[in-house]
Design a protein with these regions (language model features):
Chain B
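Terminal low-complexity/charged segments
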Residues: 1-147
C-alpha cells in the first residue's frame, strides 16, 4: 500500500475554496433583509365584465394543473415531500408527479428543509436558472424562518433572504396534507396572477 | 462478542516501560497523554501486538476554557478492546497537536472538522482546511468564547 501522502486524493484547489468563501460572504452581506413576497395579485380582486374565458384564466388553469416541481430536498422535510410524492398521498393527482432534476424543466421549487449559507448560493443559482413563470414554496419552519436554527452562524434565517417565496407551509416537518394545502393555495395564487405582471428581478449572483 | 473497554491504569502501566512520562493521567476507560508524546503513544497503540488498535472511531475536541482537550476513540478489531485517548492543549491563539492521519486515514476529515469548529491545528495533516464552513469564515464556532 502506498504511503498516505503519495495517494492522489480528490482535493479541491485552495483558489476554488477562497472563491466559494467570497461568494458566500457576499451573499450574506446582500441578504440582511428578506425579499418581499410576490403579492401583486392580492390587490386585483375578481375580474369583472368579461364572461368569456380570458387568456389569463386559461393560462392560469393550465399552469396550476401542470406544475413540475424541482427535486430539492435539503433536510427532514424532504421525507414528507417524498411521502407526498409516493402512492399513498399521490401527488400526480395534481399533475405534478414529475420531480425534475433540472431547474430548466421545473416551474416551482419546494424548498424542503434547513438552508445553510454554504448551500444558499446553489439554491439561488438554481432559482435563477428556472424559466419564468416560477414559484417557490417554503416548506417547514427552517425554510420559513430558520426555525430552531434561526440564530445559528451557519443557517439562513428564512429562504426569503435569498429567493422570493410565494407560499409558506409551517410545520416541523409539515405532513403531506399540509404540503398539499400549500400547493392548493399556490394553485389559487397562480390562477389569480396576471401572467404578464409582477415579475421580480433579483441582482445577478456571480 | 462485546467490546471490552480497557482500564486506563492498565494501559498506563504497559506504556510506562516503553514511553516513560507519556501518560499523565489515567481514568476508568481513558488515558491522558502529554501532547509532545502523542505521536509515539499512538504509534505504539496501533502497532504493538499488545494493543493493535487498528480502528480509529472518532477524533473530537472539547473546550474547557483553560485548555482544549482532543479526544481519540480507538478500537481493536482483533482484540475486541476499546480505549479513549485524551490530549490537553493549552493556548487559545495557536493550539497544536500532531496529526494521526499517517496512522489512521480516517482521521483526515475528523481532524479537519476539529480544526474548522475548534481551531486546533494538526501538525502534519496533508490538507488542513475548513470542511463544513466556508473559507473566510471568522472564528471557530464551537469554542466557548465564540460570539
Amino acid at each position: 500500500m502506498p504511503a498516505y501522502d503519495q495517494l492522489i486524493l480528490p482535493y479541491s484547489s485552495a483558489d476554488a475554496d477562497i472563491e466559494e468563501g467570497k461568494l458566500i460572504e457576499d451573499l450574506i452581506a446582500r441578504s440582511r433583509s428578506p425579499i418581499p413576497d410576490p403579492d401583486a395579485w392580492l390587490s386585483g380582486g375578481p375580474r369583472a365584465g368579461i364572461v368569456l374565458t380570458t387568456v389569463d384564466q386559461a393560462l392560469g388553469w393550465a399552469r396550476s394543473r401542470s406544475l413540475w416541481p424541482m427535486l430539492f430536498g435539503l433536510a427532514c422535510c424532504a421525507f414528507e415531500m417524498m411521502a407526498a410524492a409516493g402512492n399513498r398521498w399521490d401527488i400526480s393527482r395534481f399533475g405534478m408527479e414529475i420531480f425534475r432534476p433540472s431547474p430548466r424543466q421545473a416551474d416551482m421549487m419546494i424548498v424542503a428543509g434547513t438552508l445553510t449559507w454554504k448551500m444558499a448560493p446553489a439554491v439561488r443559482r438554481l432559482y435563477d436558472q428556472m424559466a419564468e413563470p416560477k414559484w417557490v414554496l417554503a416548506m417547514g419552519a427552517c425554510a420559513i424562518s430558520g426555525g430552531t436554527f434561526s440564530e445559528s452562524y451557519a443557517v439562513v434565517p428564512g429562504v426569503n433572504r435569498v429567493i422570493p417565496v410565494d407560499v409558506y407551509v409551517p410545520g416541523c416537518p409539515p405532513r403531506p396534507e399540509g404540503l398539499y394545502y400549500g400547493l392548493m393555495e399556490l394553485h389559487q395564487k397562480i390562477q389569480k396572477a396576471d401572467s404578464l405582471k409582477g415579475k421580480l428581478h433579483l441582482p445577478r449572483l456571480d | 462478542m462485546g467490546l471490552k473497554a480497557l482500564a486506563g491504569a492498565e494501559v498506563a502501566g504497559k506504556l510506562a516501560t516503553a514511553l516513560p512520562g507519556a501518560v499523565t493521567e489515567s481514568g476508568a476507560a481513558s488515558i491522558t497523554v502529554d501532547s509532545k508524546a502523542l505521536a509515539s503513544v499512538m504509534r505504539v497503540l496501533k502497532e504493538s501486538p499488545e494493543f493493535e488498535f487498528n480502528y480509529l472511531n472518532s477524533v473530537t475536541a472539547a473546550d474547557y476554557i483553560e485548555y482544549f482537550e482532543v479526544v481519540y476513540h480507538l478500537t481493536s478489531m482483533k482484540k475486541k478492546q476499546t480505549l479513549t485517548v485524551k490530549v490537553k492543549v493549552s493556548g487559545r491563539e495557536n493550539p497544536r497537536v500532531p496529526s494521526v492521519t499517517h496512522l489512521w486515514q480516517g482521521a483526515d476529515y475528523q481532524e479537519r472538522e476539529v480544526y474548522d469548529l475548534m481551531g486546533i491545528h494538526f501538525d502534519g495533516h496533508p490538507n488542513l482546511k475548513r470542511i463544513a464552513l466556508w473559507e473566510g469564515f471568522k472564528g471557530h464556532p464551537l469554542r466557548r468564547d465564540f460570539l
